Design a protein with these regions (language model features):
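Sec-dependent N-terminal signal peptides of Gram-positive bacterial secreted proteins and lipoproteins
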Residues: 6-25
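Short, Lys/Arg-rich N-terminal segment immediately upstream of the first membrane anchor
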Residues: 1-5
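Surface-exposed, hydrophilic segments of mature proteins
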Residues: 18-22, 28-186
Length: 186
């Protein structure tokens, strides 16, 4: 019995020594480290330019119109930052009246070579806009739809607002601009 206890004691002691040796070996061959990574995003800046057909700035106070008029208005967007980006614009119709609608009162001649109108209501520039570049015109004229604008619109102010969004193209691969990641919610 004494010999059996001695054998068990020897086996337990051997197991403890093997465990301690293995842990020491693992500690000797492994290490734990800490790294801090700093990620900085670039700033995206753009400018919307509106011109008349003769190249002068579109008047801030707007123009007087009558139904059926075609107004010369050229809208361009400039990349005014140091990063290339994808670009989209949205046209927002407005009127200073609660009773009348501004829906479908404007008809634009979209530049379909450089821009694509998508079902989400945004018009996407078909390529990456590099720093310092300016887009081709989104459109060059606006028609006031005569069938929609009647005498009830006399004295009212109609507005066509151009809103633009951009997301960086660096590290944001996409086959088409509308597939890029990071567009703000509409």
């Amino acid at each position: 019995m004494e010999k059996t206890k001695l054998k068990i004691f020897a086996i337990v002691l051997a197991a403890i020594l093997m465990t301690l040796t293995t842990q020491t070996s693992l500690a000797y061959y492994s290490t734990v480290g800490k790294a801090t990574n700093v990620i900085t995003s670039g700033n995206i800046e753009l400018k919307i330019h509106e011109y008349t057909g003769d190249g002068s700035r579109f008047p801030e106070e707007g123009v007087y119109i009558i139904p059926g008029d075609i107004v010369s208005k050229r809208v361009h967007v400039e990349n005014s930052c140091t990063h290339p980006f994808y670009l989209r614009v949205r046209l927002i119709n407005g009127i200073d009246s609660d009773e009348l609608s501004a829906e479908d009162v404007f008809k634009i001649n979209l530049n379909e070579t450089a821009w694509t109108l998508r079902e989400d209501g945004f018009i996407y520039y078909n390529r990456i806009l590099e720093p310092g570049e300016t887009t081709e015109a989104v459109f060059t004229q606006v028609e006031i739809v005569g069938a929609k604008v009647d005498q009830n619109y006399i004295g009212k102010t109609l507005t066509l607002t151009v809103s633009a969004h951009a997301v960086q193209s660096e590290n944001n691969p996409a086959d088409f601009p509308w597939e890029a990641q990071g567009w703000p919610a509409a």
